[in-house]
Amino acid sequence: VNAESGFEIKPVYRPGDVSPDASIGEPGEFPYTRGVYPTMYTKRPWTMRQYAGFGTAAESNARYHQLLAAGTMGLSVAFDLPTQMGYDSDEPIAHGEVGKVGVAIDSIDDMRRLFHEIPLDKVSTSMTINAPGSVLLLLYQLVAEEQGVPGTALQGTIQNDILKEYIARGTYIFPPKPSLRLVADTFAYCRKEIPKWNTISISGYHMAEAGASPAQEIAFTLANGMEYVRAALAAGLAVDDFAPRLSFFFVARTTLLEEIAKFRAARRMWARVMRDEFGAQDPKSLMLRFHTQTAGVQLTAQQPEVNLVRVAIQALGAVAGGTQSLHTNAYDEAIALPTEKSARLALRTQQVLAFESGLTGTVDPFAGSYAIEALTDEVEKEATALIERVFSYGSAVDAIEQGFQKQEIETSAYRIANEIDSGERVVVGVNRFAAETEERYEPLRVDPAIEAAQVARLAALRADRDSVAVETALADLAKAAGGNENVLPLMKEALRLRATVGEVCHTLRGVWGVYHPVERF
């Protein structure tokens, strides 16, 4: 049997299969193979952070209140595609996409509605937003200030990982160089203004969903992480001033053993890179802390209830692998946005693992398993070789511009598709054990009238604000973007005056330009 990462999985593992110098160590100690904290889940479970957002800010706010009442421990905001791409809801390119795959946020007014009656000093919030990540973070900070909550009390994460957008996802705006400058500006701003905030979630999840193997997922993610560290150092930041706030985001597939090994390998690889290559001294700079989401790409529209089983196995792998927070997908997400019932069942899956399985009673319970330790070594070996190939191009950005990571992922995705089509890779309910008839399922649908209502609110905002003050603030932002000063303070002032997400992003487009990928065959 071959692992997803390409190496052979043996039918039996013995003591001789484990490297005698395997860096297993102790939990909470370098190189953190067994976990970043000594006690891990024995004192408190991982953060159960369910990703949600659709339609209007008011509708998403209602869903957040439902999730908090059901026991979720942190919020995770999904934004619609126009917001992710830095467009306002009334722009022609946004037509038909407003509120579809996440919530539409155009201005501080929408952000205020999104977190209505949610005390921002009492909840940790993750925002899946990249190219305009700094814009949404500043809107969040402004709403917190209206609540009387200082930036020093805010806790959460913005994804803010633009490099993986060039590789796998595509919601980029600006070219790599100014994008990395914006990331570094965010690091510097948050160090002073929002010190408990995780300023980036360096993401392998999207690459995995595009077809990357476990080894490719962690290799390309860690290579991107190294690029961000270099950008911050080049901007004059000291490594231990920002590295403790770096975080990561990985997938959890149903291939349980390899996934556990992947998480363990990633932790020790990052610890060594930060210590040996970047000279980090603070132990927190060496710790790879990560969020996990179960693999949406493995969910099926056929017999969707079977996805409950898939998600439970995936979640088990994430927890056994030492994740800091977890989102479990709803069983109906291969069809549409989750319903209230399916979202509740997804959360209950985590709660059963945390409170009924006994898994939280022992740190890294798979440690010492011949199979797990050997697989951890193998995944690390494969991923290390891939990182070397990335940097043979000069940098991660150079490799991206040559299409290396994208081509590697596409080759892997093609192999997986062929294996499913041929039946070599079994997908229960799809190419084996299919049902003769499928039960009718009624998915959650987003009301098309939402777009018209959002556009009307945006028109009212433009009519009500001080347009001269907004234009002046945007001009100041453009001047800063063309120079060397940190753009976030000026961006915040424009947003406070009710400039829109689209207006801020268009201002930066005018200075930095937009990215046009080079197609390679």
Which residue ranges define each predicted feature?
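Active-site capping/gating regions of soluble enzymes
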Residues: 203, 219-228, 235, 244-429
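Catalytic alpha/beta active-site cores
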Residues: 1-253, 258-259, 277, 284-291, ...
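Generic secondary-structure signature for well-ordered alpha-helical cores
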Residues: 73, 116-120, 145-150, 184-196, ...
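Flexible, glycine-rich loop/tail regions that form catalytic "lids" or insertion modules at the edges
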Residues: 1-20, 30-32, 81, 339-340, ...
